[in-house]
């Protein structure tokens, strides 16, 4: 309808302009030179075209095949990566070994009337190994690995995305046995709604049709990966399409150790390096983070002309990954340096007294956008946190600002990220965990007419934690000063140095 309207408007525009020229020539300038009248007519047509150039391009017929060939960027290859290259995901690998057995010993499953799953969906945070697992499965089954990104199928022209989906599955059937891997599948598989986006809906519909259209004995498996499973259309998740839905989470300590072994097996390590210690210090880090850390440590060793990678390089690499690049010549004012020292001292002291985490290092060496940081890690991997533990985390986060207020009788902008994280935890306590005076219930802010009651509860939690932080710091002000002065002197304090300083201050108090 829209295109027809554009055609009518363009035709009328040209007709009116030509009519105007005709009247001008016949009535106003009847003796006008014929060549000049021709030039005027041509000029009007050219100007009209230039004014409506974009509309003309939209009205031109689209060659879907050419678009598919030029824009589609799928990889189509055999891979040498196997499960030996995957670490820390033993449970997932065991699940995938069933798929391998299915593909290599089809007959015994056919006798039992069992069908191989058509699709597997990996979901979880970025960097946890979803792409690596898909590639390894292709390597283990000697299948052709065909990968694509969900965004490759999202286009302006209606029908292009669907055309690419058809081409992808046609390629897979031609190359069978094959594995189709669609990364960020949420870009193409988002829930359908009332919005008028026919291209997006057609693309998703075509994907659904293709997944229904091939038989499990054709040797094709579709693997999708996403970190937003909540956004996927229900039709995509139903059995018969994605039969297996597997969560790939951040690795625990044992898994991190296995991942570190894989990423250091071809690297010369010094005797000072303890992979177990590194696994303990890297709580919350994904496989991608660990790979980046190991690579960074190797680069640092080369830059220092060392023959082996030592503990020092790994510690520096860990800080780079977590806190950012160290600034060699920071233009930090002395006043800002003092504020940063007392700010970090406040965090560290409350963290130690409330036993929030193990304090590994305190530093006022600027990294990234931060003037200082406290490197701290949990003593063990925990799946559950109590209300007290969450409030202690908030109190530690607010310790930096509380320390500034006590020492300088003033607060700075340095607590921005601390406040964001503290508010996030308090929000989760109120809305997700039922840990407020509102009782054992959850809240969806999108469904509430007013968020005032939730905001009040968040304020109560943060204010009570801030009062506790100030109380602890006032009672241990001498220790805050001692830690800050040591930071101003040395710029960084290790775990061992903090313990020594703590004991000295305790002795002085006695």
Swiss-Prot record:
- Write down the species: Thermoanaerobacter sp. (strain X514)
Annotated catalytic residues: 344
Gene3D superfamilies in the record, alphabetically?
A: 1.10.8.60, P-loop containing nucleotide triphosphate hydrolases, Peptidase M41
Q: What GO molecular-function term can you cite, just one?
A: ATP hydrolysis activity
- The identity of this protein, by name, is ATP-dependent zinc metalloprotease FtsH 2
Describe its membrane topology: Multi-pass membrane protein
Residues bound to Zn(2+) = 343, 347, 418
Record family assignment: In the central section; belongs to the AAA ATPase family.
Residue sites binding ATP per the record:
124-131
Q: Name one GO cellular component term.
A: plasma membrane
Q: How does it associate, per the subunit comment?
A: Homohexamer.
Q: Which GO terms describe its biological process?
A: protein catabolic process; proteolysis
Q: Quick one: which gene encodes this?
A: ftsH2
Which CDD domains does the entry link to?
A: RecA-like_FtsH (cd19501)
């Amino acid at each position: 309808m829209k295109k027809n309207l554009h055609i009518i408007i363009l035709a009328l525009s040209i007709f009116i302009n030509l009519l105007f020229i005709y009247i001008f020539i016949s009535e106003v300038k009847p003796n006008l030179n014929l060549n000049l009248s021709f030039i005027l007519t041509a000029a009007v047509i050219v100007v009209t075209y230039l004014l409506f150039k974009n509309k003309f391009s939209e009205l031109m017929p689209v060659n879907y095949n050419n678009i598919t060939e030029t824009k589609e960027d799928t990889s189509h290859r055999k891979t040498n990566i196997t499960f030996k290259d995957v670490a820390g995901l033993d449970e997932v690998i065991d699940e995938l070994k069933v798929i391998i057995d299915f593909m290599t010993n089809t007959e015994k499953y056919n006798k039992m009337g069992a069908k191989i799953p058509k699709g597997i969906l990996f979901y979880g945070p970025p960097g946890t190994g979803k792409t690596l697992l898909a590639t390894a499965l292709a390597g283990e089954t000697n299948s052709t690995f065909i990968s694509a990104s969900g965004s490759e199928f999202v286009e302006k022209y209606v029908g292009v995305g669907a055309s690419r989906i058809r081409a992808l599955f046609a390629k897979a059937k031609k190359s069978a046995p094959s594995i189709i891997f669609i990364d960020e599948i949420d870009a193409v598989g988002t829930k359908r709604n009332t919005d008028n986006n026919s291209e997006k809906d057609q693309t998703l519909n075509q994907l659904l049709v293709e997944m229904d259209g091939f038989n499990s004995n054709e040797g094709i498996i579709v693997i999708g990966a996403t970190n937003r499973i909540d956004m996927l259309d229900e039709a995509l998740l139903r059995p018969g399409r994605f039969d297996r839905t597997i969560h790939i989470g951040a690795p625990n300590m044992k898994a991190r150790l296995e991942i570190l072994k894989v990423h250091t097996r071809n690297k010369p390590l010094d005797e000072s390096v303890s992979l177990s210690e590194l696994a303990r210090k890297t709580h919350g880090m994904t496989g991608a983070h660990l790979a980046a850390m190991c690579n960074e440590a190797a680069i640092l060793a080369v830059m220092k002309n060392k023959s082996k990678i030592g503990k020092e390089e790994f510690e520096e690499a860990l800080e780079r990954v977590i806190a950012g690049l160290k600034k060699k010549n920071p233009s930090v004012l002395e006043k800002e340096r003092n504020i940063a020292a007392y700010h970090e001292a406040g965090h560290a002291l409350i963290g130690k007294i409330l036993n929030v985490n193990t304090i590994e290092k305190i530093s006022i060496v600027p990294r990234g956008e931060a003037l200082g940081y406290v490197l701290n890690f949990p003593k063990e991997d925990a799946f559950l946190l109590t209300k007290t533990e969450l409030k202690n985390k908030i109190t530690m986060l607010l310790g930096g600002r509380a320390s500034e207020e006590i020492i300088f009788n003033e607060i700075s902008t340095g607590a921005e990220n601390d406040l964001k994280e503290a508010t996030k935890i308090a929000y989760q306590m109120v809305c997700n965990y039922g840990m407020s005076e509102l009782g054992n219930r959850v809240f969806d802010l999108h469904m509430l007419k007013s968020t005032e009651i939730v905001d009040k509860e968040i304020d109560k939690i943060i204010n009570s934690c801030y009062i506790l932080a100030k109380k602890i710091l006032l009672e241990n002000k001498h220790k805050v000063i001692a830690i800050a002065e040591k930071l101003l002197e040395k710029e960084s304090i290790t775990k061992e140095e903090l313990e020594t300083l703590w004991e000295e201050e305790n002795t002085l108090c006695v």
